[in-house]
């Protein structure tokens, strides 16, 4: 039937965590029906306890039911990323380390997933391949070594673009130190090797572990 029935719906958390995506859920509900009223009790990046009411939605029952699954999917996905990020952020709170996101995101959802990482207290790495140059193992092999790869890149890169080199051995790391590489990615290294690299970081390069 076309008869409109107004209902009130409550969105509650079912575990402790960090909220992300409240602005998106409002857009989802209003995209289906501009007359739907969404009241957020919290803000993005807030910590939330299990059982807390996060938001209240008032409007036509058909409109709310049509939008709820998409809205909750966004809220759950983004809050999940923010909450998981926050666990790692808290575990390194007394260090100088930072938690960074990667470019390995869900197709079409990169912007909101990177935003969710920031809600959890993390930082964003490159947004895309053109935001900085990462020399990976394939590039090093193709060029015939780290030094040659750096030479090719330096001759062709835009001015002011940062270069990062991915290494997976201590030897490669020490070579990067000798070549004054300012950003070094330690790829799949054990905690023991990472610790060795930190001790040998004589030039004060920024190190990332992946």
Question: What are these model-predicted stretches?
Answer:
Residues 1-179, 183, 195-198, 206-208:
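Acidic/glycine-rich phosphate/pyrophosphate-binding loops and surrounding catalytic core
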Residues 188:
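Short secondary-structure boundary segments
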Residues 201:
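Short hydrophobic alpha-helical segments of the AMP-binding
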